[in-house]
Amino acid sequence: MTITYTSQVANARLGSFSRLLLCWRGSIYKLLYGEFFIFLLCYYIIRFIYRLALTEEQQLMFEKLTLYCDSYIQLIPISFVLGFYVTLVVTRWWNQYENLPWPDRLMSLVSGFVEGKDEQGRLLRRTLIRYANLGNVLILRSVSTAVYKRFPSAQHLVQAGFMTPAEHKQLEKLSLPHNMFWVPWVWFANLSMKAWLGGRIRDPILLQSLLNEMNTLRTQCGHLYAYDWISIPLVYTQVVTVAVYSFFLTCLVGRQFLNPAKAYPGHELDLVVPVFTFLQFFFYVGWLKVAEQLINPFGEDDDDFETNWIVDRNLQVSLLAVDEMHQDLPRMEPDMYWNEPEPHPPYTAASAQFRRASFMGSTFNISLNKEEMEFQPNQEDKEDAHTGIIGRFLGLQSHDHHPPGANSRTKLLWPKRESLLHEGLPKNHKAVKQNVRGLEDNKAWKLKAVDAFKSAPLYQRPGYYSAPQTPLSPTPMFFPPEPSVLSKLHSVTGIDTKDKSLKTVSSGAKNSSELLSGSDGALMEHPEVSHVRRKTVEFNLTDMPEIPENHLKEPLELSTTNIHATLKDHVDPYWALENRDEAHS
């Protein structure tokens, strides 16, 4: 059985733990009193022999042996060995408790998913939950001595109502040399599938949820079976037991009080009762007894699990949930807080002291002075570092100082401040220096800068950067040219459209590179890098002659080589191409 003392330590008060020392059931005294009396008896027998039965020479030999044992007794790592062992045992003990099968979730699913108020529906639900309880009992009687004493055979399970005679015969037909705790779970799965095929379970998702919960309980039963089969290695238990008992066997000799007249170091007092030796025995052997009791919680000790109570409780609760409580709901009605947005449940006189306001945060009650709540100018506005994109990337700071209070748009227009302020003024900079200062003082340059910022195109605004698109592959994408585009290409000066190769004609002082597409598809200039080299092609689009009516309009054949042609000097800048209308392209 389990010793529960939770209510006695609910409040940490003076003597709350001390009162637990007076308990006997499940206490360390009940586990330790036998070994302690044996140790006490052996200690005083050795003391009596040393004092009364030995001669002077024999006493001298015994005293040397005592000093030797006392000096080397600390070499036994009893605390280290016991600490790891008890930690392992307690962890294993709690894991076994977490794997105890509780059918509460499964019975809720069976009661809600398996429909039917008729006799067949009731039989189906009760049979399903009885199979779950039968699987739990079969595994518990395999690992718990208390449950096995209650149900020593399968016939006892039939008499107790966990299994019908037909199911018992079906179980005996299997005749496998293994534990049969898994058989009821197979019956449960097949019966659930039959209920779904018969329309008792509406949706296959509900069937899957039911089988998932069944598998969870089946897994817990398998874990209990594995914990019972695989114990803590015997060698570890033996090492811990030998270390503890050999330590205190040595203490029987090494902790004896010697004759004070012989002035041995540490033996100035001749005490009858070795208090600290007895306390050490109480702690270390008691520590070992804790591991001995928790190593198998399915026994009959005071702190073992209440397995028989678990069997009774699970059967009673689960049958009630799937039978009498199926679709037996109370009438719905508005609660007492129906029209209250913030319900306030009442407190009794004994619990009124525990009423607390809602916690808003640890900084909720902090108060600041009025001066401390005023915003200060940002450090950026004071320093006003104005760097380009490369300077910002390299961490460089500008030495230009902008006036405080400038917003983000006026900061971007700061490089153009001088040109905006000097627009329409004489070229003599010294003559208009005072006027510029006056404009700065009156912040007139800001208004003019904002107007210029709004009226300027997007590509001319400071801070606008247009990066070319990076191709995803070295092979350029090819789009068939439209007729309108072909007509424009025919009108480009310096290109012979009748030729199959695309060539640029140099005019004036402009130097143009040649882009040829030969029959072999290689570039004429540096063919070894033709697959990665980009050529610059110049087109003169300033004077575009009209296309004659009798001009041959034939498709322009492009070369098959990997070439990216980039317009370099166009009469319109690149931003004009970006902002052009789709209809006029």
Swiss-Prot record:
InterPro entries: Bestrophin, Bestrophin-like. It catalyses: chloride(in) = chloride(out); hydrogencarbonate(in) = hydrogencarbonate(out); 4-aminobutanoate(in) = 4-aminobutanoate(out); L-glutamate(out) = L-glutamate(in). Residues 346-379 are annotated as: Auto-inhibitory segment. Keywords: Calcium, Cell membrane, Chloride, Chloride channel, Ion channel, Ion transport, Membrane, Metal-binding, Phosphoprotein, Sensory transduction, Transmembrane, Transmembrane helix, Transport. GO terms for biological process: gamma-aminobutyric acid secretion, neurotransmission; glutamate secretion; protein complex oligomerization; regulation of synaptic plasticity. One of its GO terms (cellular component) is presynapse. GO terms for molecular function: bicarbonate channel activity; intracellularly calcium-gated chloride channel activity; ligand-gated channel activity; metal ion binding. Ca(2+) binds at A10, Q293, N296, D301, D304. The keyword Calcium applies. It is found in: Cell membrane; Basolateral cell membrane. Residues 52-60, 256-274 are extracellular. It comes from the Eukaryota. It is a multi-pass membrane protein. The C-terminal auto-inhibitory segment (AS) modulates the open/closed conformation of the channel. In a closed conformation, the C-terminal auto-inhibitory segment constricts the channel concentrically by wrapping around the channel periphery in an inter-protomer manner. To allow chloride movement, the C-terminal auto-inhibitory segment opens partially, leading to significantly smaller chloride movement. Ligand-gated anion channel that allows the movement of anions across cell membranes when activated by calcium (Ca2+). Allows the movement of chloride and hydrogencarbonate. Found in a partially open conformation leading to significantly smaller chloride movement. Upon F2R/PAR-1 activation, the sequestered calcium is released into the cytosol of astrocytes, leading to the (Ca2+)-dependent release of L-glutamate into the synaptic cleft that targets the neuronal postsynaptic GRIN2A/NMDAR receptor resulting in the synaptic plasticity regulation. Belongs to the anion channel-forming bestrophin (TC 1.A.46) family. Calcium-sensitive chloride channel subfamily. Interacts with YWHAG; this interaction promotes the ligand-gated L-glutamate channel activity leading to the positive regulation of NMDA glutamate receptor activity through the L-glutamate secretion. This is Bestrophin-1. It comes from Macaca fascicularis (Crab-eating macaque). The lineage of its organism: Eukaryota, Metazoa, Chordata, Craniata, Vertebrata.
